[in-house]
A protein has these predicted regions:
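Extracellular glycan-recognition regions
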Residues: 1-220
Length: 220
């Protein structure tokens, strides 16, 4: 339905210089190994979000390479994130955020949350799904089967692709469709549009990321 148009942002995520302007909320630890950004934790309770500083418009295709290194844990992408009154996500008038999930789903921001690697708890590892939630609130709006292997069976980075155009969200892994959703703009509040994107992990997860790109979404 949509393809990549003009490139709005590109980041290799391979050196400290690549993320010097990114913002960490919570107890995340950054390292760079094998040409990738590795995210891990400072302690078992150190969940965190690493935010890209750019604010993106609506109508985008987000792609990135992902590789799970150690589980249990969880990996998530926040997108269309902004203050609940339309403020920039980093506005000084918003409440301070420290990585606790409640601050993101029931605080003073709106966002969409794509959990694409859910292996924190035994029940998540026993029946693996990718979940899409909308906030403010903890609204589960779509689910799909998770095709990603556990770290011991992973043999290459996996190409993640998220399409967000107005009320439409589509997510795929290595071109395999995983979930799709249309927001009616009523059930869970108005449709979310532009905003920031961020990488979230729940400890003790360790994962690698590289080659993040954001393109304008163009109808095929």
């Amino acid at each position: 339905m949509y393809k990549e148009g003009v490139c709005l942002y590109r980041n290799p995520l391979r050196t400290p210089e690549d993320v010097k302007d990114w913002r960490m909320e919570g107890g995340g630890r950054l390292s760079f190994e094998n040409g990738s950004l590795n995210l891990s934790h400072e302690d078992d309770g150190a969940h965190f979000v690493l935010w890209c500083p750019e604010t993106f418009p609506d109508g985008i295709v987000v792609t990135w390479n992902f590789y799970p290194i150690e589980q249990p844990g969880l990996c998530m992408l926040f997108f269309a994130a902004a203050g609940d009154k339309g403020e920039d996500l980093f506005d000084s008038g918003l409440n301070k955020r420290t990585g606790s999930y409640q601050e993101y789903h029931s605080g003073d921001i709106n966002a969409l949350h794509l959990s694409y690697f859910r292996r924190k708890y035994a029940e998540e590892r026993a029946f693996r799904t990718c979940n899409l939630r909308k906030s403010r609130g903890f609204h589960l709006v779509a689910m799909g089967a998770d095709p990603l292997p556990s770290p011991e069976d992973a043999d290459s980075p996996y190409r993640m692709k998220l399409i967000k155009v107005k009320d439409y969200v589509h997510f795929s892994i290595n071109d395999l469709p995983v979930l799709e959703w249309r927001d009616d703009g009523k059930t869970y509040g108005p449709v979310l549009h532009g905003g920031k994107i961020g990488l979230r992990q729940m400890a003790p997860m360790k994962a690698a990321y590289h080659d993040l790109s954001v393109h304008q979404a163009v109808r095929r």
